[in-house]
Amino acid sequence: MIRFNIDTNSKAAVYRQLVDAVTEAVRKGSLKAGELVPSMNALADELRISKETVKRAYNILSKNGILEARQGKGFYVADDSTKDSVSVLFLMDKFSIYKQEIVHGFHQVLTVKSEDTMLLFNQDISLFEYFINENLGRYDYYIISPHFSLDQNTQEKAMKIIKRIPNQKLIIVDRLIPGMIGNFGAAYQDFENDVAIGLEQGLMKLKSIGKLNVITLPASLYGSLIQRKISGFCQENGIEVEFMSCAPEKVRKGDAFLVLTSQLDPGLISLVDNAKGMSVGTDYYIISYNDSPIDRVVLNGLTTISTDFNEMGREIARMVNAKTLWKKHIDFKMNKRNTF
């Protein structure tokens, strides 16, 4: 029989330690669906704590859907395999147009009824931790976009917090935290390397132009990673590259731009304004980073390099439908339209 370790000298309440210990055992598979857990009396005696403390922990675990009480038999690890609906917590850094595409794709493919909750943590690790603490054990699936500051301490803290969620309930979207392992689900892009895959699909034209002007946002979370890969790609292929934080005042005929900010940000708008009198796609060229449905009509078709956010949502829905989790890197490509 599994043993739980409780530290009565810890600042953490004993009942909370027990809740976390049982949740972790379920996450790791040490306790399996349908398995009987120790009775309240037996566990109280084993841990030398009060029965009321065990009762409080078991009640919380039952409320959170981790355990279920069976009349006259005791507490068992909950088995949700026969449910005809799922509860889903979308825990997103922000609800951008791209996150909307993920959610839209998810519901296009999902074959069971879902009860969704969405919480936004704005890349704030403390708020993220609060949301996890408040909602641990309450949902069938936790779909998380783990975008935080890239410093080591924050990344390690994020990983530690996320690992509190049972693997079989955890699905990561958009980004994998380096070094994070486990049998959780994931549908993601590779922020450091994918940009080269997209640019490769326009290589012949870029070589004929000879130079790529990159309009970037200095505060972008992954800007430095993406810029480093762009620099390497251009160097390897003999293409001159220049990075700028805003659109140039004068756009010259033959200029090619990669806009790393959103298609609705000032970078693209200023660029088009400063190129009045010239025809985009003929006199000068624009590639935008990240694709959304509106790009099909912007400038009669805005060329993008992007992962497929809709497919990302579809892939995680396939996991929920199959009740089996896996990891998949979503294809990154150039969507060729009017502007390039």
Label every PLM stretch briefly.
Residues 255, 263-340:
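Flexible loop/turn connectors
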Residues 1-45, 133:
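Extreme N-terminal segment that seeds HTH/winged-HTH DNA-binding domains in transcriptional regulators
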Residues 176-213, 290, 305-325:
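Hydrophobic alpha-helical segments within soluble ligand-binding/sensing domains
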Residues 36-37, 69-83:
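Short, Lys/Arg-rich nucleic-acid/phosphate-binding segment
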Residues 32-69:
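N-terminal helix-turn-helix
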Residues 193-234, 328-340:
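An alpha-beta-alpha
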Residues 110-122, 212-216, 231-247, 255-256:
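Short beta-strand elements in bilobed, periplasmic/extracellular small-molecule ligand-binding domains
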Residues 78, 83-197, 256, 263:
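Alpha-helical recognition/docking segments in bacterial nutrient-uptake
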